[in-house]
Amino acid sequence: MLGSIIGGIGSSLLGGIASGGISSLLNKMFSKMPEHAASSAGLTNGQGTIGMDTDAGIQSAIQGSNVPPAGQLPASNTSGVMADAGNMIRNAGRALLDGTIQAGSDKVKEALIDKLVGGNDAKDRGKATRDYLAAAFPELNPWERAGAGASTAGLESSAQNQQKEMLKMQLDNQKDIAKMQMNNNLQIAGIQSATSRQNTKDSVYAQNEMLQYNQRESQARVASILANTDLTTKQATHEIMRMALTRAQETGQHLTNSQIMALEKKVYAEIGKIHQDTQNSRYGSSQVTAAAKDVTNMITDASSGLADWASQQWDSFFKDGKSDGIPLNTRK
């Protein structure tokens, strides 16, 4: 825009001055000379007359031998074809001079623009501008040289640094929070595991104590039932076998199915034998003691750990020396 303005001004000045001056000069140089009708006696060229004057001599298109007086320029009167030729020459010269001056003014304008903006190529002008700004203002950065304000560039840089710091703080906080959560989860898991183990241990101990208590209570109830209820031989055998097996499990002894069946048959047979002996001697104790010993020996054959318990059970069921006899359904 600056180049166009300056070029217009230069062109106007140079064109106006040159055109005005040259035109004025041409007008003065090629001004139409005065045409005088030449009159002479009897001579004419169709546009005027050619006459003879005794004082000025013969007036014609071509000055002849009649020389004007000394100190006086001959008058040049042109007309007809010669006048048109003069006009053509004058106009051609003026056009040629105007074209030359116009071309010169254009060259001057282009040269002036090149000097001001540094060439016609945009790339060259841009490079020249950058080099000039870098040399003239070395303290500015490229953004500021391109037109960005220093305050705006500083604010932008500060905002970017602030965003980086905030992002770093967020990442650090997330990492710390994740670490704290992991530590809390580990502590909670450890507490739950320890509590579970302790609860399991206490529960197992309590269950064992309760089982033993229930077994003792069950044995007492069975003993009471056997002592106060008349049972058949089969029922008595079943109760004795149940208590015997429970006791064997408590002591860690395990019997096979065949051993259990054999033991049950022997107990059943011994109870039948006790029933027969009781009928023979209702209040006798020797038969009861012998039967108890036989059952004890029989249980010992199946499991040695049940011998003492079986003896105690028989001693509790069949009161030795009691006058009421055996509390079974063998009474008649």
UniProtKB/Swiss-Prot annotation:
Minor spike component of the viral shell. Involved in the ejection of the phage DNA in the host and is injected with the DNA in the periplasmic space of the host. Involved in the determination of the phage host-range. GO terms for cellular component: viral capsid. Phi KhT, a host-range mutant of phi K, can grow on E.coli C and B, besides K12, and is more thermosensitive than the parental phage phi K. Pfam families: Microvir_H. The keyword Calcium does not apply. InterPro entries: Microvir_H. The keyword tRNA-binding does not apply. Changing residue 67 to A: In phi KhT mutant. It is found in: Virion. Keywords: Capsid protein, Viral genome ejection through host cell envelope, Viral penetration into host cytoplasm, Virion, Virus entry into host cell. This is Minor spike protein.
